[in-house]
Amino acid sequence: MKKLARKQCWEYCLNLYRDYGYDPYLIYAVVETESNRIIDIQSHSGAYGLMQITEIALREVNQKYKTNYTLEDLKIPEKNIEIGAKYLYRWIDYFEIEYSNFVAVFLAILVYNWGYGNVQHWLDNGGEDNQKITELLPFEKLQYNEDVIWWYVWAKKYFGGEYV
Protein backbone atom coordinates (compact mmCIF):
# COMPACT_ATOMS: atom_id res chain seq x y z
CA MET A 1 0.00 0.00 0.00
CA LYS A 2 1.46 3.28 -1.11
CA LYS A 3 1.09 6.40 1.04
CA LEU A 4 0.82 9.90 -0.32
CA ALA A 5 3.51 12.15 1.14
CA ARG A 6 2.19 14.68 3.66
CA LYS A 7 3.57 17.61 1.69
CA GLN A 8 1.95 16.41 -1.54
CA CYS A 9 -1.38 15.80 0.20
CA TRP A 10 -1.21 19.29 1.67
CA GLU A 11 -0.50 20.77 -1.77
CA TYR A 12 -3.63 19.10 -3.15
CA CYS A 13 -5.63 20.53 -0.23
CA LEU A 14 -4.18 23.99 -0.83
CA ASN A 15 -5.18 23.79 -4.50
CA LEU A 16 -8.78 23.24 -3.38
CA TYR A 17 -8.49 26.27 -1.12
CA ARG A 18 -7.21 28.35 -4.04
CA ASP A 19 -9.75 27.02 -6.55
CA TYR A 20 -12.90 26.74 -4.41
CA GLY A 21 -12.19 28.36 -1.04
CA TYR A 22 -12.38 25.00 0.75
CA ASP A 23 -10.74 24.82 4.17
CA PRO A 24 -7.46 22.95 3.47
CA TYR A 25 -7.10 21.86 7.10
CA LEU A 26 -10.53 20.25 7.07
CA ILE A 27 -9.85 18.42 3.81
CA TYR A 28 -6.46 17.24 5.06
CA ALA A 29 -8.06 16.06 8.32
CA VAL A 30 -10.64 13.99 6.44
CA VAL A 31 -7.91 12.40 4.29
CA GLU A 32 -5.95 11.38 7.39
CA THR A 33 -9.05 10.10 9.17
CA GLU A 34 -10.42 8.20 6.18
CA SER A 35 -7.28 6.61 4.75
CA ASN A 36 -4.16 7.64 6.65
CA ARG A 37 -3.01 8.87 3.20
CA ILE A 38 -3.01 5.33 1.74
CA ILE A 39 -3.67 5.95 -1.94
CA ASP A 40 -5.27 2.70 -3.10
CA ILE A 41 -7.13 1.68 0.05
CA GLN A 42 -10.59 0.19 -0.44
CA SER A 43 -13.18 -0.45 2.25
CA HIS A 44 -15.42 -3.50 2.56
CA SER A 45 -18.30 -1.25 1.44
CA GLY A 46 -16.52 -0.32 -1.79
CA ALA A 47 -15.33 3.16 -0.82
CA TYR A 48 -12.07 3.92 -2.59
CA GLY A 49 -8.94 5.98 -2.16
CA LEU A 50 -7.69 8.77 0.03
CA MET A 51 -11.14 10.23 0.74
CA GLN A 52 -12.93 6.85 0.64
CA ILE A 53 -15.40 7.80 -2.08
CA THR A 54 -18.35 5.52 -2.83
CA GLU A 55 -20.06 5.24 -6.21
CA ILE A 56 -23.11 6.94 -4.71
CA ALA A 57 -21.03 9.92 -3.53
CA LEU A 58 -19.37 10.11 -6.96
CA ARG A 59 -22.78 10.25 -8.66
CA GLU A 60 -23.99 12.92 -6.22
CA VAL A 61 -20.92 15.08 -6.91
CA ASN A 62 -21.38 14.71 -10.67
CA GLN A 63 -25.05 15.63 -10.39
CA LYS A 64 -24.61 18.57 -7.98
CA TYR A 65 -21.58 20.13 -9.68
CA LYS A 66 -22.36 19.02 -13.25
CA THR A 67 -19.02 17.24 -13.52
CA ASN A 68 -18.07 14.01 -15.27
CA TYR A 69 -15.79 12.26 -12.80
CA THR A 70 -15.39 8.53 -13.39
CA LEU A 71 -14.55 5.57 -11.18
CA GLU A 72 -11.07 5.70 -12.73
CA ASP A 73 -10.67 9.24 -11.36
CA LEU A 74 -10.92 7.81 -7.85
CA LYS A 75 -7.52 6.17 -8.44
CA ILE A 76 -5.85 9.54 -9.06
CA PRO A 77 -4.93 11.07 -5.66
CA GLU A 78 -5.57 14.70 -6.60
CA LYS A 79 -8.95 13.90 -8.18
CA ASN A 80 -9.96 11.63 -5.30
CA ILE A 81 -9.32 14.44 -2.83
CA GLU A 82 -11.17 16.94 -5.04
CA ILE A 83 -14.21 14.67 -5.38
CA GLY A 84 -14.28 13.98 -1.63
CA ALA A 85 -13.93 17.68 -0.83
CA LYS A 86 -16.80 18.55 -3.16
CA TYR A 87 -18.95 15.86 -1.55
CA LEU A 88 -18.14 17.18 1.94
CA TYR A 89 -18.82 20.77 0.95
CA ARG A 90 -22.07 19.77 -0.71
CA TRP A 91 -23.26 18.83 2.78
CA ILE A 92 -21.71 21.84 4.51
CA ASP A 93 -23.60 24.10 2.08
CA TYR A 94 -26.79 22.11 2.69
CA PHE A 95 -26.64 22.39 6.49
CA GLU A 96 -25.53 26.04 6.50
CA ILE A 97 -29.00 26.97 5.29
CA GLU A 98 -30.36 26.07 8.72
CA TYR A 99 -27.37 25.97 11.08
CA SER A 100 -24.24 27.94 11.94
CA ASN A 101 -21.05 27.07 10.07
CA PHE A 102 -19.69 25.18 13.08
CA VAL A 103 -22.78 22.97 13.33
CA ALA A 104 -22.96 22.58 9.54
CA VAL A 105 -19.37 21.30 9.45
CA PHE A 106 -20.06 18.89 12.33
CA LEU A 107 -23.15 17.53 10.55
CA ALA A 108 -21.41 17.35 7.17
CA ILE A 109 -18.59 15.29 8.68
CA LEU A 110 -21.22 12.99 10.18
CA VAL A 111 -22.90 12.61 6.78
CA TYR A 112 -19.54 11.92 5.15
CA ASN A 113 -18.98 9.00 7.51
CA TRP A 114 -22.50 7.81 8.34
CA GLY A 115 -24.71 8.84 5.42
CA TYR A 116 -27.39 11.47 5.10
CA GLY A 117 -30.30 9.18 5.99
CA ASN A 118 -28.73 8.19 9.31
CA VAL A 119 -27.88 11.78 10.21
CA GLN A 120 -31.37 12.99 9.31
CA HIS A 121 -32.90 10.22 11.43
CA TRP A 122 -30.64 11.26 14.32
CA LEU A 123 -31.67 14.92 13.93
CA ASP A 124 -35.35 13.96 13.73
CA ASN A 125 -35.03 12.03 16.99
CA GLY A 126 -33.44 14.67 19.17
CA GLY A 127 -30.00 15.13 17.66
CA GLU A 128 -30.26 18.88 18.17
CA ASP A 129 -30.62 18.40 21.93
CA ASN A 130 -27.11 18.42 23.41
CA GLN A 131 -28.34 16.28 26.29
CA LYS A 132 -29.14 13.46 23.87
CA ILE A 133 -25.99 13.50 21.73
CA THR A 134 -24.28 10.72 23.66
CA GLU A 135 -27.52 8.74 23.96
CA LEU A 136 -28.54 8.79 20.30
CA LEU A 137 -25.28 9.14 18.38
CA PRO A 138 -23.29 5.92 18.08
CA PHE A 139 -19.95 6.22 19.86
CA GLU A 140 -17.91 5.36 16.75
CA LYS A 141 -19.56 8.22 14.82
CA LEU A 142 -18.77 10.73 17.55
CA GLN A 143 -15.24 9.30 17.66
CA TYR A 144 -14.91 9.80 13.89
CA ASN A 145 -15.76 13.50 14.26
CA GLU A 146 -13.28 13.79 17.13
CA ASP A 147 -10.58 12.20 14.95
CA VAL A 148 -11.25 14.72 12.19
CA ILE A 149 -11.00 17.56 14.72
CA TRP A 150 -7.74 16.14 16.09
CA TRP A 151 -6.22 16.00 12.59
CA TYR A 152 -7.52 19.51 11.86
CA VAL A 153 -5.69 20.90 14.89
CA TRP A 154 -2.59 18.86 14.01
CA ALA A 155 -2.58 20.18 10.42
CA LYS A 156 -2.89 23.79 11.59
CA LYS A 157 0.15 23.33 13.83
CA TYR A 158 2.17 21.34 11.29
CA PHE A 159 1.43 23.38 8.15
CA GLY A 160 0.91 26.75 9.83
CA GLY A 161 -2.32 28.54 10.53
CA GLU A 162 -2.30 31.15 7.79
CA TYR A 163 -5.19 29.77 5.72
CA VAL A 164 -8.89 30.17 6.45
Residue ranges and their predicted role:
Residues V31-E32, I149:
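Alpha-helix boundary recognition
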Residues K3-K7, E11-Y20, I56-V164:
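Non-catalytic cell-wall polysaccharide-engagement segments
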Residues P24, E34-A47:
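Conserved alpha-helical segments that form or flank metal/cofactor-binding pockets of metalloenzymes
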Residues T33-N36, I56-L58:
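Solvent-exposed coil/turn segments that connect beta secondary-structure elements
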Residues I41, S45, T54, E78:
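Solvent-exposed, flexible loop/coil residues
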